[in-house]
């Protein structure tokens, strides 16, 4: 399929020099997509993988336990793409009001990502549409406090931004002028609402992600919010009952190719190459998520079996174990509140779990000690390793 530039350039003057800013054509692509057999087959496979992922809730004993960790893993990965150095353990320690091992602003960025997703899903559940208003509200949550809090959170940019380089004149890409942002985002909102015509949900998510990245409507947080919108849109369109598809690890692993594909769409209209990549990302990510869920179930069952052999101590230790599935890094004080067991008994249970190799203490103090469920963290940490 031969297409030309998917938009047009306008000359802008900013930071004392002229530059060419790109204004994209509205969606859907024109001419229409070329659904070659290979691409159609890849998208069909992606839809099947998405269906298997959505069925996780039928075999997970408690989907909320899986989501708690999975959402936080995504927050770490999505923020890592933007340069933060927070690990999953750092985030969980931060949520316990403990000192993480990296700069506080890094962990706060990751924590804000979790909060922004939670906020968006809550608004959708209340019947609020996926709209420019909701996108801006989520952006306000994403940039609350920490780095980026001075970058007009919750508001479309009023000044020019650019991607790569030190100024627009040597940038890799210059998004639309600030005066055109509302117009471009308004057209994207129409597309999200199936105007001028309906678009299947997975295809809509793939196309909208590129368009959002191209418009780059905010001064900061565009990448994180653009990845968040994929999951949010699939939930709104009822493709997923729970927010379980996160593509950041795949995008991170193929980062250079990802950026090349975005530019390929803008410069030559090669939407098909992007869609092939996006479908592969969905297949790989959804399959990995199902495998991760099964590993977590197997781990919990194996540990329960070992705890059951403790004899009289088994009943209370199983209650503590159940609570630890919910919070794999937690303090003994929280376990007392969660289980309703006395502090002395909780501490005995923790000693049993340490002896079994289920837990590892992260502190060396007498009160409100902090423990890590090592097996869960080993499973969830795969792919989140910080660069050495």
Spans of features found by a protein language model:
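FIC/Doc superfamily catalytic core
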Residues: 1-388
